[in-house]
Amino acid sequence: MPVVQFSDKDIDELITVPKYLPADYRSRLRTRARSYSDKHEEGQLEIDVQDKGTFRVIIRKNRINPLDFSAILGYIPPERTRVFRLRRYNGIHKHTNKIERNSFRAFHIHYATQRYQEAGWDIDAYAEITDRYTTIDGAWELLLDECNFIRPEAEKIQPKML
């Protein structure tokens, strides 16, 4: 029987816990070439939340195809090293939800779920089509907004550029 790491309630609590962004978060999330891949660039940012663990935002994009990207919210529990993906905001590629047996090729968001863990699939194997972004920048801005990241005070006073 598969081991369930997080219940749906646990996942919801992790998504809604306030995560305070440092003043330099945008520069830290800027993607850069990585030695392990000549096709992708990646940026990462870790935020420690007292008594909860570490949250990691990962921005990954293809150097050639602008529709091939992911903005990921990972979670590392205290005393652990494994990253659990709680949300994944993806570009366009084919995805199949194994339990529902439906496939699509579109922008989509992966959600960590208890039932996919119980079925033995990846924690974030379930996904839904979205029209709330069309670029990597739009995807990670949505991730920050939906997953309760608190922006620095200086940024809050500035109007958001569209």
Spans of model-derived segments:
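A short, compositionally biased
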Residues: 38-42, 65-68, 106, 115
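Surface-exposed beta-strand edges and flanking loops
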Residues: 8, 49-51, 59-61, 88-91, ...
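Generic low-complexity segments that are intrinsically disordered, proline-rich and/or Lys/Arg-biased
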Residues: 19, 23, 109-111, 160
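Charged, low-complexity, helix/coiled-coil-prone segments
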Residues: 9-16, 47, 77-91, 145-147
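Charge-rich, low-complexity N-terminal segments
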Residues: 1-64
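Acidic, proline/glycine-rich low-complexity IDRs
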Residues: 130-162
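An exposed acidic His-Trp-rich patch
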Residues: 70-130
